[in-house]
Swiss-Prot record:
It holds the Pfam family Beta-prop_CAF1B_HIR1. It comes from Caenorhabditis elegans. SUPFAM superfamilies: WD40 repeat-like (SSF50978). Residues 439-468 have a biased composition (Basic and acidic residues). WD repeats lie at residues 14-58, 72-111, 131-170, 174-213, 222-261, 277-320, 325-362. Residues 520-542 have a biased composition (Acidic residues). PANTHER family: MEMBER OF THE HIR1 FAMILY OF WD-REPEAT PROTEINS, PROTEIN HIRA. Keywords: Chromatin regulator, Nucleus, Repeat, Repressor, Transcription, Transcription regulation, WD repeat. GO terms for biological process: chromatin remodeling; DNA-templated transcription; regulation of DNA-templated transcription. This is Protein HIRA.
Amino acid sequence: MGDVYVTSPTFVGHDTGSILAIDCHPSGKKFITCGQKARTSNGLVVVWNAEPVLDKKKASNENVPKLLFQVESQSQSNSCRWSPDGKRFAFGSDDSSVSVWEYVGLINSMGSITGGAQNVERYKECCVLRGHSMEVLTVEWSPNGKYLASGSIDYRIIIYNARKLPDRITVLNDIQLPVKGLSWDPIGKYLASLEGDKKLRFWATDSWQCVKSVTEPFESNIEETMLTRLDWSPDGKYLMTPAAVRSGKPLIKLIQRQTWKSDQFLAGHHKGTTCVRAMPRLIEANLKNGKRMQLTCAAVGSRDKSISIWVFPGTLKPLFVINNIFNHTVMDFAWCGRNLLACSQDGTVKVIHLSESVIGEMISNEAMSDLCYQIYSIRPPRYELTDKEEDESQDSFNLSDLSSSANNASFVTCPEDVLIKRKKLVAAQQSSDIQLTKSMEDNSKENESKNSEKTMMEERNKQIDVRKDGKRRIQPVFCGTTTADPMTSLSSEGKKTVAPPPAKRKALAPAVPAKKGEVDLEDSSDSDDDDEEEEEDMEISDIESVRNKKRKVPATTSQPMLALDLKKPALRPMEPKSLKTQEGTVLMEAPEQQPKLSQHVVDRKGMFVEIDNRWKHGGVETTQIKLIKKKQQTAENEDDMMDGERRVNHECLWMAVLGSPVIIVAANKHNVVLGCGDKCLRVYRTFCGTHIVSLRLDSLPVLIGVTEHAAYALTENGRLSTWNLKLGKAVVTRQPLFDCVEASTDNSLISADVSETGVPLIVFSNGSIFTFNVSLSCWIQAITTNVLGRLTSPISDAQLSCSNGTTNSAGPLVRLLKRMRKQATAPGVAPQVVKAVKESQLEQLLHCAEQLGNPQDYQTMLMLYVETLCEGGSEKKLKNILNDLSRSGAPMQVCGLRRSALYDDVTRMIKLKQPAIAARIVAGVAASTTTKSLF
């Protein structure tokens, strides 16, 4: 046991008050405790520096702070937890409230809020949640940071919207006992709750319904605990719940996921178990037979004042047990890497240091992400942190870098977070530049004032004149003030003419490919004559407006360009839509009706569709639709401008009024598509606002989109329809998504789009890509990320770009393949297996590209397929491609590309890669074509 030792940081405590909960910051640099202050009924929450606790040398260093922040509450605090991004923490108290605090930076002056200790960090109370009527016993953040759950003695669980506190998502009321413990599934599908040590419930996060209740392990439990801490295994396969009893012996029950079996357990303590906490990631252990196995390492605490460390499955005894480590009940655990922090009701904290030789090697975040993806087709956000970033987050504690470390510890789960983070970074840089400029000006003024004062004092010393008889005579000397006269300063400044600084202009960026999460199909079809005329009219109006602005702007003033007129806004990727399978159908949730909506018109700069669902006119409340264009309004002279600001004028191009609300909008340069609350899809001409058609759907629309003259709609019943608005015909009619969904696995819809011809392209969270064969009237699976992906080499981005040259010319299928996560080839796979699987995948992708009709996608897939066949020496398949491209009676073009040109490209590559094969098959194909043409 030399590799395991226990330390007792004496400086960590609540002045002999009880410590009821402990949690480690995601960065591993600090941890938080909560409980009761000594000899009072007040609560105490303290943020501690983790390095003095984990390192003895830094514990003795006086320059290393130990207490970072503390706050005293009016009542006892029972539970505290950090948010996944590490920027906030929440704690629940006996006064029925949940308090949320946010990190705002470091402080210079030493002090604390309602306390006497010295704080190093500054936190502000951003929200107090008062939804409960009795004591709050547990609080937990969801792994993705989207929800905050709290459980109370009032028999209720409240789910809050963590991104918009204090907004509630739902209240779970169907509970008969106090809620003593909560735990979120790391995959994000379930919330587990333990009620009065008598019943365990599993709540589905997509419907907030109880999907399973477990009571058998707790039927004979008569020794209830004050607080209960349950936890999931890192891979989400097991829920570890304390307070279970079997044959009168206390134990930890392991509830298996999906099957909900509870036949496995961890036993050995003499009194009731109170808490359990698993290591953040699985460990790899060497078995006696030489094999390596991935196991869960967990700590168990009990009322017998002891701690046991377990690895499972496959073990019957704990790895080791530390008896009587505390003087009272073990209340909670927190893992900081391989170090276990434990707190007790006796008011102390113990640290158990575990070496790799004892518990095994902890696997990487990337390996955990791949493991969860193989099991659930989902990559949890908590495992998306790379090993390099994790190592950086575990670096030594530095006060100057504390703020940045908190920011770096956060993860991004949605595009809105990316935009907010970028805005904050730009604002921080601008504020730092302004502060630096001001400080330099202040320093220069201060130095100038000091020099003037020094000169004045020297002149005053010269006033005293000592005569020969010893008498002193003071001579008058003029002494001016050390600061300039305000009137003089103003007048002097008024005479100077200061040239305004040159305006900063944003450069016109070239067209960029679709960003992560987008399925933006390329514009490859030609427009009609009327479309060209309307585009020309809009361009002329833009040119005239620019000319008018140039006339009004003085030549000596440099005007900044409006950002709306400079660049096309990037499309935001859609949020994943959860799919619920029920009785052979897929059910989805339509977006909530909003009072107002705004949607940018694709390929139209500064043009937006504005929706007002509560527009009142003549005493009637209806829905107003307006197409507006935002223009820059420039003042004719500088006196009309305030602080150099430029006003934006909204020009209404057309307006329409509807009797039903609009819940979702999509628009491009041709059509405006509105998904309405009366189950209709209404289409308007973008140019003039003419109502084209109103299409009746089978249920409310969940997703809609438009690409060129093609539109699609996905409804609540999971049925997809697409239309070619240019030809006025349906392409796909109410086709169910259930045929594409695997009901046995957790799945969600990542993206959906439609090609210019009306062929859909949908992507699921398990990596599967589907399109629709209109001729065969059936879904076609283009690619799937399953076990076959481990049997072949992945398609690299370089291979996908070599045919097109640049990313800008890539089609929607190629862009999707570039964004997909590449799977590593399993070791020991035979070359012939790699070749067979690779060719089969490319054949599927080639067929998908042909159905979509995009020329860039088809050419890329064709040339990549030919290159792969040349590398494998597949002579018969190469000959089949040439026969297909040169067969008589076939259309002259495929996906808008001439067959003869494709034939020449394929022939050229075969001659380059396999000259011998080219000499045999090219001549044979040419002879066959000549023979067929004679008849």
